[in-house]
Amino acid sequence: MKKFKKLIIACDGESASGKSTAARLISKKYRLILLNSGLLYRYASKLLIKNKPRDPISFLNSKFKKVTYRNISNQNLHSQQISDHVALLAKNKEIRKIVNNFQKKIIKDNKKICVEGRDIASKILAKKPKYDIAFYFKCNLDVASYRRWIDIKKKVSLNDVKKSLRKRTAMDRTRKFSPLIKVKDAILIQTDKLNKKQVLSKMCKHIDKIN
């Protein structure tokens, strides 16, 4: 395994495509800070669902100034209610700005980091600092739905999970601000055809080629 003094990795992909697991594994392998942008939007959704503020933007702006990423990452943010809500929230330009600013502060302070989300290579790490390598994750809808269904401990029907994932990906791809896209130089990882070990191995082969 090659050692790096600086390494910035962008991991983008569809819902339940395995990007979070892959980002976690690769971060551990290369001793990188892991930043999951999806958790930030889920945290925002949880706050809005729970508090129902009159002015959501000011409310979230205040909350994100006080919270740490560690605190957010330790919360349970994967309920189906949050999953259904977060796609709508992620379309809001002002909310995206709040989340993006939070991410950029963390990225600025870390030379070795893996950032995972939906607009990382195309927006967050598109320039200064730009990613050293980008990955894009895809997964067959049936496989992705089953994996998410297991993750949420079968609390809703498999069919409902499938509908939710299909809707979320469609919304991510067609939203006006920072839509989900694969940048030209991103390496495609089709996770339904690979196990965790194979995904990690494939990523490592590409990372170790970086000069």
Predicted regions located by residue number:
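Walker A/P-loop
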Residues: 20
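ATP-binding Walker
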Residues: 14-17
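Conserved phosphate-donor/acceptor-positioning beta-strand/loop module used by diverse small-molecule
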Residues: 128-151, 162-166
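NTP-dependent small-molecule kinase module
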Residues: 2-4, 77, 101, 146-154, ...
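ATP-dependent small-molecule kinase phosphotransfer cores
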Residues: 39-113, 119, 124, 142-146, ...
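Hydrophobic anchor at the beta1->P-loop junction of P-loop NTPases
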Residues: 9-11
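Post-Walker A helix-loop "phosphate-sensing" segment adjacent to the P-loop in P-loop NTPases
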Residues: 27-37, 50-53
